[in-house]
């Protein structure tokens, strides 16, 4: 202030006020230029690497595309794309696998000064940062958008269970991350009764919010107490009547199993529980259910395959192909699942089957390939192409939690979705690290939901006359050929649906797509064809 008054006096004395004002304005303008962010253009977020930051070290910049939170452990890691497990999108050791692996290794940067309690997948629009190095930037400002808790509380994620019409039956499968009632303090799951009550509160709120008619659980305590407790909580919280399938077992330390809880107002079990004890026991079970309103029957198979961790030998050794250890055992479990299905459908006198559970294998790994080649349809890929995930490990998204069905049940599937209340959340919200009593981070895996309309085919566009769908480009605009009467969905590679419409012409143009990579789903004749679009 004294310096300013001194300048004023000097310029007044020499009668040069206009010159003084000009100098002040010039100084202000120069200062504004010095703090303005350089706008950095990212041509293709799918191939962007942190090396592109090197030229901006020491500068303040603003990105012209949104960034995504990819990791929220001990700070934030961000990228202009969601980072996926390579084997969730490509066959192990294939050329595409190696390409994804290479891009993943240099596609993220560390964001300092922005905290850790952000959900994975949150978008940072107009992100302004100070570039510390080509791998680290300091947060200045952004507009946070998308993938919020409020969105999930409104049930927006669950809309996908009705992609092909309104469901009449909702099925949910969830890994409960060691839900224990009797065997507390074993080193797995809750250490004491207080921890159990906190875990129970979070899980019960999640299940009540989902409000399914049929639940399959993995990583739930052996015996009947845990299932009985969940059934009781569901009955209390929903006003409906829930019960469970008693498998006759008893609790044994922290060992877990697969189990079933169902709404007896809507469903009744048919026949006796069938167990498949190939590999890890008590974790692969099938039960048939009849929908009371329609009298329709289907088989529900809940499974938990051998984990990827530990030391293995022979075909169980880690081969460095992204599939981890015990892949051989998981392949054998997948084959046994198919062979048991043959006897199960004879016993239950029905062939419609829905297979769900934590198979500890990503979408393109060998066990899932076995199931697909055995005639099972991957519902994640059928409805969401490459964008689906239910689990995030060290910032890498993918789905270990599967939903598959055979071709006779598929026409009655209205949709499916992984409900992202867990995998995107910070680990600091778990029951043993906080007093958070919300449904968020009730487990480390997302629940997977499947909508059914039994007795009424919901497959759209049965009047499509050919399966020879083609996609071609005319002046950089993609068009679909030979799918008139069908329906298409376009997703960004991060999983966001950006465009969907009926196919009303023989050559349907998909307009309005900017440069980038997209996933295109074309529906018709009870099938879904997926392809990647590279818009130049």
PLM region spans:
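Extended non-catalytic accessory segments flanking core domains
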Residues: 36-186, 194-201, 236
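Sec-dependent N-terminal signal peptides
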Residues: 20-30
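N-terminal, active-site-proximal structural segment of metallo-dependent hydrolase catalytic domains
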Residues: 94-96, 134-237, 241, 246-256, ...
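C-terminal outer-membrane/trafficking sorting elements
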Residues: 2, 462-536
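Structured beta-strand-rich core segments of catalytic domains in phosphoester-bond hydrolases
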Residues: 221, 226-306
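Active-site His/acidic residue clusters
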Residues: 292, 296, 302-327
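Metal-dependent phosphoester-hydrolase catalytic domains
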Residues: 38-47, 56-58, 63, 113-136, ...
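Active-site-proximal beta-strand elements of phosphoester/diester hydrolases
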Residues: 168-184, 271-273, 297-307
